[in-house]
Amino acid sequence: MKQILSLLIVLLYCTTIQAKERVVELPAFDAWSSTSIEIQKIVLNDTATTVYIDAFYRPHNWIKIAKDSYLQADGKQYKILSGIGMEPDKEIWMPESGTYSFQMIFPPLPENTTTVDFTEGDFEGSFSIWGIHLDGKPAFSPLA
């Protein structure tokens, strides 16, 4: 009986942990500064926000994500912590295909966040994506 009760408690705990993770696939966004990077998905949980990126650039050339990159939500900045498949401020050399995938890790966003901006900063050539929708709503366009 104790084993069954212990198993039920573990399953309930795992379900609770899993429920706190939110995944937004191919989020809509309002504007971007470059077509060289695209967000494939964003995973939000209580320990981190992980942004999955596909980069497109000329083969055997490089792109770089600045170490001061951040997400901004409701006026607050969440600076990049690390990366998977990339390191902030280090060149990412593009393979022959011209496509490279990586992840950027940021602090957790508040649970009620509906939109977020990504930017490297305000300098020439910086990557920025504004109005990334975490709520499943379509992008806003003044042209629509």
Show which residues each predicted segment covers.
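Bacterial Sec-dependent N-terminal signal peptides
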Residues: 1-22
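Low-complexity, acidic Ser/Thr/Pro/Gly-rich terminal tails and inter-domain linkers that flank the onset
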Residues: 21-46, 75-78, 82-86, 143-144
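Generic structural detector for well-ordered beta-strands
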Residues: 43, 54, 93, 103-107, ...
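Short, well-ordered beta-strand segments enriched in hydrophobic/aromatic residues
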Residues: 48-58
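Envelope-exposed proteins and targeting segments
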Residues: 49, 67, 100-102, 114, ...
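The feature marks short-to-medium sequence segments in extracytoplasmic or secretory-pathway proteins
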Residues: 56-95
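Short, solvent-exposed, Trp/other aromatic-anchored flexible loops in extracytoplasmic proteins
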Residues: 79-123
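Pro/Ala/Gly-rich low-complexity, hydrophilic intrinsically disordered segments
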Residues: 128-144
